[in-house]
Amino acid sequence: FDVDGDGWTDSAYTWPLWGIVIDPDGVSTKPEPINIKKESDPINSFALDVGIPLLRDGPISLDFYAQYASLLGKTTNPLDTTKRENVGYGLIPLGLSAKLGPAHFTFEFRMVPDGKFQFGYFNRSYEVERATFQSISGNQGTIITKASKLGRFGKQNGFFSGLNINLGSIFDVGFSYQNLKGEQFDPSKNEFEKADNQSFTAILKLAKPISKIDRASWFYQQRNVPNPFDFEYSESTITGYNASLKLGNGMVLTYIFRRTFQDFNGDGD
């Protein structure tokens, strides 16, 4: 054995009459591996929606809707990291969805009354954000989950808007933007302070097949940052494209590209 990983086997320092004695060279032993079963941090969500049609006139329509959305799980209190608290909920008391020919517009007033919540928690970048490994002292590490970071979000209010347009029955283009204002935890000051929480998503896709191209799409997403139009990459940034080509005889070749960014030290940058 070489439990401390220094290259010297423990057998060289073993006394048969007394059992195994770890080599006394002063080198600290390797840390215990992370047990993902003990370190699990489950989270779930559910939502309740209600909608009322307000207008129907040929290609024109207008609908009103409202939503209550809640996350189910625990998060860490940033003011006292030994405390675990229930995650929060979000409200959309006013939502409008309008269609005018090829254009579809949505507008929502959003509220997070008690913080510890994100709209669109399970988004495209969730697989990257859901767990980050952070190195700590003593040659050890810990797992920082996305759920544990929800505690840094305080009370917030703002709006969400989205626009989808069919361009000449060939392309579909979509944009969405969220702007929430409220409180976020600043670790450098160890307190909550006023901050902007903005998100932006853009999508361009082929509306119908063209020749050998069966499907094609491109997207860009950045969520929960002070200003997504600065285009400063974070873990919530993801971009990529999909392309499918018909090869004949029922075969389709699909190429998928994703570009993501990972926070190696868990500091949020």
Regions found by a protein language model. Name each.
Residues 1-241, 260-267:
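Signature for the C-terminal beta-barrel architecture of outer-membrane proteins
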Residues 247-251, 264:
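Long, compositionally biased charged/polar accessory segments in the mid-to-C-terminal portions
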Residues 256-258:
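C-terminal scaffolding/assembly regions of large eukaryotic complex subunits
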